Amino acid sequence: MKSVLFLIPLVHAGEVVWDGFFNSSFTADQLDKWSWSNPVGPYQWYIHGSEATANYLEVSADFKNPADESDEKGIRISIDDTSSWNGQTMMRSELIPQTDADLGSGTLFYHFSLQSRRKTRPLRPLSIKLPSSRYFILSYSYTFPSHFTELKYGGDEETLRWLADGKTQWSTDLVAGTWYNFAYEIDFSAKTVGLWTSTGAEALKKVVEPVSAATQTDSKDWHVGELRLDNGQKGGKEDWFWSGVYIEKGEITTAIAGPAA
């Protein structure tokens, strides 16, 4: 009898080069162990305000996309009127991957899922007279404050926008309670950025073909979190919820379950 070989398709396709997944025992205070002299854990945590870490970060199984099977917990990243970092007028709560991996060569896919909630959803603009009052959500910058790709929310509308080199390439209404899944397709050689996205448990689909962008990095430039331009006014506290944060090369993993499923 001839043997029969069954080929079982893999759930994921690419090779993970870095991940920010949280296991069941991880707590937010573990991020306080990181320092320039003690670079431990998945993230650098130094861009934040003057309050304790618990004011800005919390991890919980309730904070992840239920379709994400690679994380056991998601993370709440909050921003408020204490979130000035180093005396800046902008408010910031941001995590940066802690890794020695090369995050700036070839083509890489930068994955994450994002949600706002009705009770803690981002505020409307502080004033319609302040069109620059907006949020930079998960940006990629080499020369701050320019971002070669980023999500933005706010201004004079409740729209979530994706930009490349400062130009809007995709947008959608931000609906509280909806999980938005993204992957930035960054080709550092061709200097282009494309976008894959979906909602809930739906598989990622490419919605923007690669467009030109000033892609450059020293592998320390991916900011996971929020930057708010308050222009000196009070903005209150807002929460965003994140899960499924990882970077891969090769073929893209489109399943929201992620590479560990």
Q: Locations of the language-model features?
A:
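Cleavable N-terminal signal peptides of Sec/SRP-targeted secreted and luminal proteins
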Residues: 1-13
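Localized edge beta-strand/strand-to-loop motifs within extracellular or lumenal beta-rich domains
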Residues: 175-194, 199-200
